[in-house]
């Protein structure tokens, strides 16, 4: 596992929500982020195939940037959400 600093933001919509902090990138290329719910309960959020979809930032060492599309099911509907992801290995 690699330790990373990350920043994740939704691409579409009016959402200004940004997730950032310290996380881990496992051997399969999944970014694991520690989060806290609105009720204060901790949980781990996983973003699959981040290592595949992110590419090195030109002129920066150990920094990567890209887009990941995730699919969720909500009340019988499939929802597509695209995230802009930046991370730096430390």
Q: Each predicted region: which residue ranges?
A:
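A short beta-strand micro-motif
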Residues: 3-11
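Compositionally biased, intrinsically disordered low-complexity regions used as flexible
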Residues: 1-2, 57
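Acidic, low-complexity, intrinsically disordered interaction modules
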Residues: 25-82
């Amino acid at each position: 596992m690699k330790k990373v600093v990350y920043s994740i933001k939704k691409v579409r919509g009016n959402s200004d929500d940004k997730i950032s902090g310290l996380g881990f990138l496992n051997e399969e290329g999944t970014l694991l982020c520690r989060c806290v719910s609105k009720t204060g309960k901790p949980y781990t959020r996983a973003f699959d195939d981040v290592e595949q979809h992110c590419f090195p930032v030109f002129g920066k060492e150990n920094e990567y940037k890209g887009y990941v599309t995730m699919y969720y099911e909500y009340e019988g509907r499939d929802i597509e959400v695209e995230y802009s992801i930046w991370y730096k290995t430390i």
